[in-house]
């Protein structure tokens, strides 16, 4: 290798970004940070810039950029600080960049992720909303540009590892019967149904196995996360919703499975640590040390599986329906969920209201065809508006 590969980490201060930079730091001969971006944790971004000395840093606003530029200059760091969405797209698509970690949470990450794809980069996709919102457009851009798209979600990474290399020829053609998408069931898997309305944001964010941000923790608690992953799996692996089955697996040791027509089931197992799928995607088709401890099968002891309870997890049903409907439905589902989760974290609504808001939006808004990014973003805006109207009527 003549030089280290340059990586832009979009969402560097989040859990995925920090895990990515941990892998970068373990392999300075292989990787170096080209650009780091942050949204609200600007002190953390400054610390990361001091440690990794990227060429660029990106923040949301000009005032923050001026402040960070001054701090870094005073420390003798020559990182150039940019601001705004256009800057995100620029560092995602810059000619010097070899790979992009797309880890900005939610719809906000779509434009920069798409910019990386259109520039033909190796894209490490942690932003599931990009595929949920604009699946057909996104995958068309991948094929058109020749980008290498590698999934970072532990489940999709596990599926990728468990499929044959020629899966793009068609799942049935390569002998796949179905994809088994595992889910921990979150912190409320066994909570009495009558208590779900009164659970707190703190309880929802206390995931039993994974360390995650607040939004994705709530999505895991409602199993909307798994619903979004079902939609993502359909686009990544050219599967029909009927070919993807969600299985609750409380230990989070099996990260997903592929069931073949000959009766074989191939699975990927490992400790629940995002550095495993991140390092796999960074080094693919090679493998490198991720810093993750080996899996102790004797300590695991047993593996349990359950069917999801639709009464307990209505968000999973809504996501499955959106996947079947297609068009703008997944984008509206995602937008309504983002609004509802934010309101729950602000204690404006109950946990059980999240699914109510999403269903209200899907019932009120007509599904349209999606043929451009503008149409995707328009559907997103409409859904957010309808969800906001629900909050105005019902929330504090």
UniProtKB/Swiss-Prot annotation:
<feature type="binding site">
    <location>
        <position position="225"/>
    </location>
    <ligand>
        <name>1-deoxy-D-xylulose 5-phosphate</name>
    </ligand>
</feature>
<feature type="binding site">
    <location>
        <position position="16"/>
    </location>
    <ligand>
        <name>NADPH</name>
    </ligand>
</feature>
<dbReference type="InterPro" id="IPR013512">
    <property type="entry name" value="DXP_reductoisomerase_N"/>
</dbReference>
<protein>
    <recommendedName>
        <fullName>1-deoxy-D-xylulose 5-phosphate reductoisomerase</fullName>
        <ecNumber>1.1.1.267</ecNumber>
    </recommendedName>
</protein>
<feature type="binding site">
    <location>
        <position position="213"/>
    </location>
    <ligand>
        <name>NADPH</name>
    </ligand>
</feature>
<feature type="binding site">
    <location>
        <position position="155"/>
    </location>
    <ligand>
        <name>1-deoxy-D-xylulose 5-phosphate</name>
    </ligand>
</feature>
<feature type="binding site">
    <location>
        <position position="229"/>
    </location>
    <ligand>
        <name>Mn(2+)</name>
    </ligand>
</feature>
<dbReference type="Pfam" id="PF08436">
    <property type="entry name" value="DXP_redisom_C"/>
</dbReference>
<dbReference type="Pfam" id="PF13288">
    <property type="entry name" value="DXPR_C"/>
</dbReference>
<comment type="pathway">
    <text>Isoprenoid biosynthesis; isopentenyl diphosphate biosynthesis via DXP pathway; isopentenyl diphosphate from 1-deoxy-D-xylulose 5-phosphate: step 1/6.</text>
</comment>
<feature type="binding site">
    <location>
        <position position="128"/>
    </location>
    <ligand>
        <name>1-deoxy-D-xylulose 5-phosphate</name>
    </ligand>
</feature>
<keyword id="KW-0414">Isoprene biosynthesis</keyword>
<keyword id="KW-0479">Metal-binding</keyword>
<dbReference type="InterPro" id="IPR026877">
    <property type="entry name" value="DXPR_C"/>
</dbReference>
<feature type="binding site">
    <location>
        <position position="153"/>
    </location>
    <ligand>
        <name>Mn(2+)</name>
    </ligand>
</feature>
<feature type="binding site">
    <location>
        <position position="229"/>
    </location>
    <ligand>
        <name>1-deoxy-D-xylulose 5-phosphate</name>
    </ligand>
</feature>
<dbReference type="GO" id="GO:0070402">
    <property type="term" value="F:NADPH binding"/>
</dbReference>
<feature type="binding site">
    <location>
        <position position="13"/>
    </location>
    <ligand>
        <name>NADPH</name>
    </ligand>
</feature>
<dbReference type="GO" id="GO:0051484">
    <property type="term" value="P:isopentenyl diphosphate biosynthetic process, methylerythritol 4-phosphate pathway involved in terpenoid biosynthetic process"/>
</dbReference>
<feature type="binding site">
    <location>
        <position position="155"/>
    </location>
    <ligand>
        <name>Mn(2+)</name>
    </ligand>
</feature>
<comment type="function">
    <text>Catalyzes the NADPH-dependent rearrangement and reduction of 1-deoxy-D-xylulose-5-phosphate (DXP) to 2-C-methyl-D-erythritol 4-phosphate (MEP).</text>
</comment>
<dbReference type="Pfam" id="PF02670">
    <property type="entry name" value="DXP_reductoisom"/>
</dbReference>
<feature type="binding site">
    <location>
        <position position="184"/>
    </location>
    <ligand>
        <name>1-deoxy-D-xylulose 5-phosphate</name>
    </ligand>
</feature>
<dbReference type="InterPro" id="IPR013644">
    <property type="entry name" value="DXP_reductoisomerase_C"/>
</dbReference>
<keyword id="KW-0560">Oxidoreductase</keyword>
<feature type="binding site">
    <location>
        <position position="14"/>
    </location>
    <ligand>
        <name>NADPH</name>
    </ligand>
</feature>
<dbReference type="GO" id="GO:0030604">
    <property type="term" value="F:1-deoxy-D-xylulose-5-phosphate reductoisomerase activity"/>
</dbReference>
<dbReference type="InterPro" id="IPR036169">
    <property type="entry name" value="DXPR_C_sf"/>
</dbReference>
<feature type="binding site">
    <location>
        <position position="226"/>
    </location>
    <ligand>
        <name>1-deoxy-D-xylulose 5-phosphate</name>
    </ligand>
</feature>
<comment type="similarity">
    <text>Belongs to the DXR family.</text>
</comment>
<dbReference type="InterPro" id="IPR003821">
    <property type="entry name" value="DXP_reductoisomerase"/>
</dbReference>
<feature type="binding site">
    <location>
        <position position="207"/>
    </location>
    <ligand>
        <name>1-deoxy-D-xylulose 5-phosphate</name>
    </ligand>
</feature>
<keyword id="KW-0464">Manganese</keyword>
<feature type="binding site">
    <location>
        <position position="127"/>
    </location>
    <ligand>
        <name>NADPH</name>
    </ligand>
</feature>
<feature type="binding site">
    <location>
        <position position="154"/>
    </location>
    <ligand>
        <name>1-deoxy-D-xylulose 5-phosphate</name>
    </ligand>
</feature>
<dbReference type="GO" id="GO:0030145">
    <property type="term" value="F:manganese ion binding"/>
</dbReference>
<keyword id="KW-0521">NADP</keyword>
<feature type="binding site">
    <location>
        <position position="15"/>
    </location>
    <ligand>
        <name>NADPH</name>
    </ligand>
</feature>
<feature type="binding site">
    <location>
        <position position="220"/>
    </location>
    <ligand>
        <name>1-deoxy-D-xylulose 5-phosphate</name>
    </ligand>
</feature>
<dbReference type="InterPro" id="IPR036291">
    <property type="entry name" value="NAD(P)-bd_dom_sf"/>
</dbReference>
<feature type="binding site">
    <location>
        <position position="129"/>
    </location>
    <ligand>
        <name>NADPH</name>
    </ligand>
</feature>
